[in-house]
UniProtKB/Swiss-Prot annotation:
May be a general defense protein. One of its GO terms (molecular function) is ATP binding. Residues 512-725, 1162-1376 form the ABC transmembrane type-2 domain. ATP 1 binds at residues 194-201. One of its GO terms (cellular component) is membrane. It comes from Nicotiana tabacum (Common tobacco). This is Pleiotropic drug resistance protein 1. Residues 804-824 have a biased composition (Polar residues).
């Protein structure tokens, strides 16, 4: 049959449905002998099934594709509608099709292919070509790339001048990919290999059509001869990122289902219609299960899809399908499972080409093998196209690939069949050793440090061959020549299948997109119900405080002053309802990374995401506002008319919706918390200051009046005031006037008293709501995330590859080392004392978790280590291994004294003396698995800091620096000396460089014993080799080193001298030497009857974990713990423990005069030194704060211009106080909230450094608190001088210094309050929520909204406990408290302040003392909390 032309499919399938129904004698269908019929158990069943099938065949095409025959558990077939398949039915169907993923997947895919082939339908294929591809980026190099305060300012000005073409850019061009060409063929698996920063991710992004527009690209990429602009590449191909970005509140199944619904079914439906038509014409009856599967896979819009279930199964995610994905805040699935969810998210779609970036990070080798194998089957059988980059592929995974692309330094060193790659390198003089994985060899052979060990031409001297030379040699190699010939012949476009390339931008229709996004938003709101409940309760508490503060019995309505108090209450109501929308800011930003990923993958347009997040919040608003109005309205004593009650309710609903829309918009524009909260503060400040309450309209300057008219707050406040003061209770005439009291009050504040202003306000707010939400949608559509990973390049003088060739990693018992490390020849600058560590019968248990008790666990304690014994000696490298949950990290934490809870029994000795944690911390180092370092210091500074605090006091600075230099050489960190550490995954060092820094930070402490937790996890083969070489060099200096290790390659595993193997449940099953090529280990396990022999060339580490698995133990009926306990090895180890457990003659127990190696003062100086660099190089915090302060100062200065000189009426004083009130609140809250993320990041570093015995908590707190003082001082002076001069306060030295003093201490206590918030809570999110609540209370009791004399007696005590009230008291009393000028009503300024606010000038001394006390109180609380609370759980 001719290949199907799928463009005519829909037409042909519908024509088929109108032809006559099946003939009555439909049995003739089954008499076609050439067709394979899947027979059932009995003839009768067959006949019944045939009748049902015949009935199905009579249906019109569209209905026929929606129905199928499903077999029940008894084997009877029933007709089902595809859309009505239940969970159990889908599960049973998959059980029949793919019972065991590894075994049955291929059979299932072949059945699918068989059905398609039988009627001669051709599957679409994609061939991807890239020709002469060059990709360049612009970057700052050397010290200019460090984000110091000065660089930030210089780069900012420079970028501005560049855009105006005044100055040329100082950025250097960096070439990522250099003139590369190649072909990715369908039906073949391509493996992309290359060392870090060789351009793998960039190549994959280029092939998938997802490159960053800022990059300069020349050359072309084409699919089946069509260039990327001729179709939609993002939907034709799927790019799977190496970053796992998911919404933590969704389960694994929900994540995949959402993705499947958004991506749609592609051309599956058309293909099925054509298939069905041809089968009908040829009298072919398909397998019923395959038929149902294909129909379900081709049905759009199903919430629960068979394809999703299938992908979950082959990725091994079916066991955690209903578990939350989780994130930093929510406990969820493991890292390896998250990686698989990222892969599954794209596999559920209809893409024919897959570009997968490092999909195996965090997975064990057997899982990686089974996933890659499933992908291979799918690619080869269903004619897909795949390029997969892997970090450390095991030999068996490597062998699954057909083609290899090897990238190095932006050049393609080799591209072609896997079988020819070794031949190419042998022709260049490099040979892969026998016990070396080919993939590992390929990653190392182009690296300057690793190349020499593979040189095989013994008769020629070795010279380093660059990536460029390899790339040139490849062109003349036979594989390269063949590729060149193929590229010379263009792809024949006429052979491109019409269904191969996608032209629609989205997978489903607009209505369906909106439905899918709405359902997800609803689900997330349910999952986040805690946030909404928390907001409700916070609002309830504030409502209770507000109504008891403005209690009706305490609120007369006789004078304009009384009206002013009511106006204050209404103003506060508007503020509360507006600021309650602020949580939208954080929630929007939190979801942005996932949104950007899904938007760029064309899952949905931005409007489909924006509309549900607006519409679904309306019911929340109704509840919040309803709660507030019902609680406060009548208790405060607002106008009792029910219409006015409902009008206030309506107005506040619109206010809340407007605020939520505004915060969403700000979040989408700001994109990070820092920028958004700064922008948010600006927007709020302008609204707040120009809302007509803080500064009366009559006093707004002409150049700011536009701000007054566009401030949503003005409309809100005006409407709510009119609604209240237009009521009956306020319509009596004021004595000596001709206006009602209500009208007078509204006018005195500069508002409009006419009743129609209520509706003007409501209308304006509705308009703002629509505009903000529309702009939110636009911002989502057109803005991209800020943070891009960036590399720090050395300047030309500092060549990155300046290290000489280091030794190969080998174990001490005789590996084939080519050149020994130099460190053996010369001793280190600082001597150290070698120590052994022995532990005998160590038991570790924790209290039984509540969940396990509920499941029926009877014991009180859960035992994690069951009597473990062993000895670690100097100069011996020990690997601590076992399956997940065996207790490797637990044992290490117990030995290192890092556990914060639980019960430890048994004896641990150091060189024969019982271990004391205080002294042990001084001679030991612990390299944690997650590399935690201060992000804003350089590599060299990190090491100097660690050495400064951990080496003894008698080591002078010169020796210390020499020692640091030695360690840097040992760990090969020389070229990165001035590189900034940075935040993981955002900027700074790569994973492998961070690992080496972690090791170096411990080494500079000159420890005798070092523990390392998974030093090679998440690294590629080359990086792992560098880290292991570092570890080996460390052991060769005579130290005791223990590493937990997970899935090592052969050469990493055999670099160890001894193995400590544990099984699940915390018991040891082998403790002893490995031997050459692991001979001792293999001999020990093979001597057990029934244990499978190791295959030639197989990895002993993998084999050992396989043969000791609990399933194997059950099968063989042996317990490896018992086997070990009865072996000679165990007895030998016990003898060794006894021998090392006795102190050597003449030795002394470890003893140090002090707990820390440095004095308290030195600790303080060192902590302050590190904080200094951390702040200086963090412009996102320090520079933004200064810019923000300067802007606010200029805004206030121009807004309240020259108001300080006006003191003719009471409103002037209220305006002046308003300027102080707004400034204090905004600057203070901005300081408090912006310091929190900085402190939160440093706190995690503090936990590691304190555990290492570097310093006590007080010096750390001292450094953190002290470094703020100069920055805040400059901030106060900046602000003070600008504002004082522009507002025109009296130029009196005393008053000016009072102003500066109060501003300085106010900003200090706000900043320390923010720091304290972090110190007393487990994480930054909780800290910001707790802190925010108090800002609201402080605002209410500050004395501006309701002065102290008007507060009810039962609340006055809180006025005195409120720091903001003291600040306002000080600012107003110092400026105006002694002025004798008369106001319009014959009262002096001094008398008015005493009567109305209760402010006295002679009370300033007390104010100063109280403000100072607040600063000390918050700083001390911070220090105490840091010392007392440890929120790290181990």
């Amino acid at each position: 049959m001719e290949p199907a032309n799928l463009s005519n499919l829909r037409g042909s399938s519908l024509r088929g449905s109108t032809r006559g129904s099946l003939r009555a004698n439909s049995n003739s269908i089954w008499r076609n002998n050439g067709v394979e019929i899947f027979s059932r158990s009995s003839r009768d069943e067959d006949d019944e099934e045939a009748l049902k099938w015949a009935a199905l065949e009579k249906l019109p095409t569209f209905d026929r594709l929606r129905k199928g025959l499903l077999f029940g558990s008894q084997g009877a077939a029933a007709e089902v509608d595809i859309n009505d398949l239940g969970f159990q039915e889908r599960k049973n169907l998959l059980e029949r099709l793919v019972k065991v993923a590894d075994e049955d997947n291929e059979k299932f895919l072949l059945k699918l292919k068989n059905r398609i082939d039988r009627v001669g339908i051709d599957l679409p294929t994609i061939e991807v070509r890239y020709e002469h591809l060059n990709i360049d980026a612009d970057a700052y190099v050397g010290s200019r790339s460090l984000p110091t305060f000065m660089n930030f300012m210089t780069n900012f000005v420079e970028t501005l001048l560049n855009s105006l073409h005044i100055l040329s850019s100082r950025k250097r061009q960096l070439t990522i990919l250099k003139d590369i060409s190649g072909i990715i063929k369908p039906c073949r698996m391509t493996l992309l290999l290359g060392p870090p920063s060789s351009g793998k991710t960039t190549l994959l992004l280029a092939l998938a059509g997802k490159l960053d527009p800022a990059l300069k690209v020349t050359g072309k990429v084409s699919y089946n001869g069509h260039e990327l602009h001729e179709f939609v590449p993002q939907r034709t191909a799927a790019y799977i990122s190496q970053h796992d970005l998911h919404i933590g509140e969704m389960t694994v199944r929900e994540t995949l289902e959402f993705s499947a619904r958004c991506q749609g079914v592609g051309s599956r439906f058309e293909m099925l219609a054509e298939l069905s038509r041809r089968e009908k014409a040829a009298n072919i009856k398909p397998d019923a299960d395959i038929d149902i599967y294909m129909k379900a896979a081709a049905t759009e819009g199903q919430e629960a899809n068979v394809v999703t279930d299938y992908v979950l199964k082959i990725l091994g995610l079916d066991i955690c399908a209903d578990t939350m994905v989780g994130d930093d805040m929510i406990r969820g699935i493991s890292g390896g499972q998250k990686k698989r969810v990222t892969t599954g998210e794209m596999l559920v779609g209809p893409s024919k080409a897959l570009f997968m970036d490092e999909i195996s990070t965090g997975l064990d080798s057997s899982t990686t093998y089974s996933i890659v194998n499933s992908l291979r089957q799918s690619v080869q059988i269903l004619k897909g196209t795949a390029v997969i980059s892997l970090l450390q592929p095991a030999p068996e995974t490597y062998n699954l690939f057909d083609d290899i692309i090897l990238l190095s330094d932006g050049y393609i060193v080799y591209q072609g069949p896997r079988d020819d790659v070794l031949e190419f390198f042998e022709s260049m003089g490099f040979k892969c050793p026998q016990r070396k994985g080919v993939a590992d060899f390929l990653q190392e052979v182009t690296s300057k440090k690793d190349q020499q060990q593979y040189w095989s031409k013994r008769n020629e001297p070795y010279r380093f061959i660059t990536s460029k030379e390899f790339a040139e040699a490849y062109q003349s190699f036979h594989v390269g020549r063949k590729l060149g010939d193929e590229l010379a012949t263009p792809f024949d476009k006429t052979k491109c299948h019409p269904a191969a390339l996608t032209n629609e931008k989205y997978g489903i229709g607009k209505k369906e997109l909106l439905k899918v996004c709405t359902e997800r938003e609803l689900l997330l709101m349910k999952r986040n119900s805690f946030v909404y409940m928390f907001k409700f309760s916070q609002l309830t508490i504030m409502a209770l405080i507000t109504m008891t503060l403005f209690f009706r019995t305490e609120m007369p309505r006789d004078t304009t002053d009384d009206g002013g108090i009511y106006a204050g209450a209404l103003f506060f109501v508007v503020i509360m309802i507006m600021f309650n929308g602020m949580s939208e800011l954080a929630m929007t930003i939190f979801k942005l990374p996932v949104f950007y990923k899904q938007r760029d993958l064309l899952f949905f347009p931005s409007w489909a995401y924006a509309i549900p997040s607006w519409i679904l919040k309306i019911p929340v608003t109704l509840v919040e506002v309803g709660l507030w109005v019902i609680l406060t309205y009548y208790v405060i004593g607002f106008d009792p008319n029910i219409t006015r009650f409902l009008k206030q309710f309506l107005l506040l609903i619109v206010v809340n919706q407007m605020a939520s829309g505004m915060f969403r918009f700000i979040g989408a524009v700001g994109r990070t918390m820092g920028v958004a909260s700064t922008f948010g503060s600006f927007a709020l400040l302008l609204q707040f200051a120009l809302g007509g309450f803080v500064l009366s309209r009559d006093d707004v300057k002409s150049w700011w009046i536009w701000g007054y008219w566009i401030s949503p707050m003005m409309y809100s406040v005006n409407s709510i005031l009119v609604n209240e003061f237009d009521g009956k209770k306020w319509n009596h005439i004021v004595p000596g006037g001709n206006e009602t009291l209500g009208s007078t009050v509204v006018k005195s504040r500069g508002f409009f008293p006419e009743a129609y202003w209520y509706w003007i306000g409501v209308g304006a707010l509705v308009g703002f709501t629509v505009v903000f939400n529309f702009c939110y949608s636009l911002a989502l559509a057109y803005l991209n995330p800020f943070d891009k990973p960036q590399a720090v390049l050395p300047e030309d003088g500092e060549n990155a590859e300046n290290g000489e060739v280091s030794s190969q990693i080998t174990s001490t018992d005789g590996g084939d080392s080519i050149s020994e490390s130099q460190n053996n020849k010369k001793g280190m600058v600082l001597p150290f004392e070698p120590h052994s560590i022995t532990f005998d019968d160590v038991v570790y248990s924790v209290d039984m978790p509540q969940e396990m008790k509920e499941q029926g666990a009877g014991e009180d304690r859960l035992v994690l280590l069951k009597g473990v014994s062993g000895a670690f000696r100097p100069g011996v490298l020990t690997a601590l291994m076992g399956v997940s949950g065996a207790g490797k990290t637990t044992l290490m934490d117990v030995l290192a004294g890092r556990k914060t809870g639980g019960y430890i029994d048994g004896e641990i000795k150091i060189s024969g003396y019982p271990k004391k944690q205080e002294t042990f911390a001084r001679i030991s180092g612990y390299c944690e698995q997650n590399d935690i370092h201060s992000p804003y210091v350089t590599v060299y500074e990190s090491l100097v800091y660690s050495a400064w605090l951990r080496l003894p006091q008698d080591v002078d600075e010169k020796t210390r620096k020499m020692f640091v230099d030695e360690v840097m050489e040992l760990v090969e960190l020389g070229p990165l000396r001035s590189a900034l550490v940075g935040l993981p995954g955002v900027n700074g060092l790569s994973t492998e460089q961070r690992k080496r820094l972690t090791i170096a930070v411990e080494l500079v402490a000159n420890p005798s014993i070092i523990f390392m937790d998974e030093p090679t996890s998440g690294l590629d083969a080359r990086a792992a080799a560098i880290v292991m070489r570092t570890v080996r060099n460390t052991v060769d200096t005579g130290r005791t080193v223990v590493c937990t290790i997970h899935q090592p390659s052969i050469d990493i595993f055999e670099a160890f001298d001894e193995l400590f193997l544990m099984k699940r449940g915390g018991q040891e099953i082998y403790v002893g030497p490995l031997g050459r090529h692991s001979c001792h280990l293999i001999k020990y396990f093979e001597s057990n009857p029934g244990v499978a022999k190791i295959k030639e060339g197989y990895n002993p580490a993998t084999w050992m974990l396989e043969v000791t698995a609990s399933a194997q133990e059950m099968m063989l009926g042996i317990d490896f713990t018992e086997v070990y306990k009865n072996s000679d090895l165990y007895r030998r180890n016990k003898a060794l423990i006894s021998e090392l457990g006795v102190p050597r003659p003449g030795s002394k127990d470890l003893h140090f005069e002090t707990q820390y190696s440095q004095s308290f003062w030195t600790q303080c100086v060192a902590c302050l030194w590190k904080q200094h660099w951390s702040y200086w190089r963090n412009p996102a915090y320090t520079a933004v704060r200064f810019i923000f302060t300067t802007f606010i100062a200029l805004i206030f200065g121009t807004m309240f211009w020259d108001l300080g000189t006006k003191v003719s009426k009471s409103q002037d004083l209220l305006n002046a106080m308003g300027s102080m009130y707004a400034a204090v609140l905004f600057l203070g809250v901005q300081n408090a909230s912006s310091v929190q993320p900085v402190v939160a990041i440093e706190r995690t570093v503090f936990y590691r450094e304190r555990a290492a015995g570097m310093y006590s908590a007080i010096p750390y707190a001292f450094g953190q608190v002290s470094i703020e003082i100069p920055y805040i001082f400059v901030q106060s002076v900046f602000y003070g001088i600008i504002v004082y001069a522009m507002i025109g306060f009296e130029w009196d030295v005393g008053k000016f210094f009072w102003y500066l003093f109060i501003m300085f201490f106010t900003l200090l206590y706000f900043t320390f309050y923010g720091m304290m918030g972090v110190a007393v809570t487990p994480n930054q999110n909780v800290a910001s929520i707790v802190a925010a609540f108090f800002y609201g209370v402080w605002n209410l009791f500050s004395g501006f909204i309701i002065p102290r004399p008007r507060m009810p007696v039962w609340w006055r005590w809180y006025y005195w406990a409120n720091p903001v009230a003291w600040t306002l008291y000080g600012l107003v009393a110092s400026q105006f408290g002694d002025i004798q000028t008369k106001l319009s009503d014959n009262e002096t300024v001094e008398q008015f302040l005493r009567r109305y606010f209760g402010f006295k000038h002679d009370f300033l001394g007390v104010v100063a003392a109280v403000l100072t006390a607040y600063v000390f109180m918050f700083a001390f609380t911070f220090a105490f909390a840091i010392k007392a609370f440890n929120f790290q759980r181990r």
